[in-house]
Amino acid sequence: MPPAGAAPLSYGIENDIQHPVYARHGMVSTVDETATGVGLDILRAGGNAVDAAVAVGYALAVTHPQAGNLGGGGFMLVRTRQGETVAIDFREMAPAGATRDMFIGPDGNADSKRSLTGPLASGTPGTVAGMSLALDRFGTLPLARVMQPAIKLAREGFSVDKALADDLASYGREALINHPNSKAVFFKADGQPYAEGERLSQPQLAHSLTLIAEQGPQAFYQGAIADEIAAEMQRDGGLIGKADLAAYRAVARQPVSGSYRGYQVFSMPPPSSGGIHIIQILNILENFDLAHMGAGSADAIQVMAEAMKFAYADRSEYLGDPDFVKVPVQALTSKAYAKTLAQRIDVNRANPSVTIKPGQLQPYESDQTTHYSVVDGQGNAVAVTYTLNTYFGSGIMAGDSGILLNNEMDDFSAKPGVPNMYGLVGGDANAVQAGKRPLSSMSPTIVVKDGKTWLVTGSPGGSRIITTVLQMLVNTIDFQMNVAEASAAPRFHQQWTPDELRVEKGFSPDTLKLLGERGQHIKVLPVMGSTQSIMVMPDGTFTGASDPRTIDDLTAGY
């Protein structure tokens, strides 16, 4: 197979969405300009990519509270200069008091209000444990040093950007307004949310961050912060207790990996479904000449959409927390299995979802997670996707800690066979169980070429994370786009149920008409995903791009 074309070193036009940012020594790509600056400062000060990634994670908890967090969880993928790749799972866990039917209402149906908005919605947070595990194993700077910028931002405040102002005015009014502690932080005395350009300080969060910096993660899991979280839960009828917090552990796992046209792809293993299904879909696509079909062509979209259907059907049946259920990783990611699925794809006629597996109900979908990527000049690379689940999580702030808590329990299958808020159907493998981690679509991904890191990428977007990351890989490898072109190209999504091909604006009307004639049910939707990506060039320099769909994000290097 011919290797993918390398992105040009620099066009010298950094504000053009078709041209990447260029740097020689290190690069950071995040959803927030301030957090990107924090990461770069750590790199310039001699820290490595993991040091910078941990600093960014804590900074985003201050400046991007929609998804950046201490009270949530996520996944980190680390590739070291020595060529070791490790997946760090800091996904939230169901508290000990959680039961399989806890979100089933009196009518026998799943009650999404309880799994999204109430005190029962929160799982035991993992972010603080995950960041410390990464830093202890791969970092070079002390925790107090990498947390210093976040503490300063929380204590002294920062200028609210348009993205945060808009989200406070919309989602914040829903999620935060009914919780006095949260309202006191994000809304002013006159009842209005902080607006663009106004200064937002969070002294309580600064205090919590300082405790973690001084005492380590035990401050969060066994100390004063644990007391605040447990008391808040007890007050409101939540389940997280001090024993749940003390028992939480982040886990280093073997990443899922596969090959695609000569490239090695590493991504998250279960409890993320992302890595398995990205590799499964790539394995199917390897049976087709996408480059010949062409980017944005009806043939390429048809083949990719059909491959997506098969993967999402399998997701509903087989995926869950590997500590509780046996996930058939090898079978799902085998080339032989993919070939049998590829043989069922007709470029001229779509397979109705009902012929693959029964689908049901209409989903709701939004970009409510955040992803960032970091590389350094020594050959280390980090991809992180973490979240509170929906914007601002449950909206509940733990006492006087300044920490927003997640509503991640909605990612379990409250009633197997019935979609969650992202329209994703789950089976018994993802049923609620004490101590279990809910299934996720988060897919921090690193692509390796000739033994060296080539692409670091990921995205928010609920169920669309998998297909967004997939299209970044296909755009760069098959269609030979540079990292900025690949980020800007219009996206599409098919998740098996409902049986519709969701497309962004930007595709040719003739192409969409052709796809409709081939049996695809087209639905034009707003933008999908928010990739933050970095590509490493053959000479070791970097090109990067933040998604043009997102305001106030920034990729920068030095």
Q: Which residues make up each language-model segment?
A:
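Short Pro/Gly-enriched beta-strand edge/turn motifs at strand-loop
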Residues: 56-61, 238-240, 350-359, 422-432, ...
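Short, small/polar residue-rich loop motifs at catalytic or cofactor-binding pockets
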Residues: 252, 366-369, 391, 440-442
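Extended C-terminal subregions enriched in glycine
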Residues: 415, 436, 478-526
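Noncatalytic scaffold domains of N-terminal-nucleophile
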Residues: 5-37, 41, 49-215, 220-222, ...
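Active-site rim segments in enzyme catalytic domains, especially the processed small/beta chain
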Residues: 62-87, 239-241, 381-449, 479, ...
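Glycine-rich phosphate/pyrophosphate-binding beta-alpha loops
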Residues: 266-275, 373, 385-396, 444, ...
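Internal maturation/activation junctions in enzymes
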Residues: 288-388, 400-401, 408, 416-417, ...
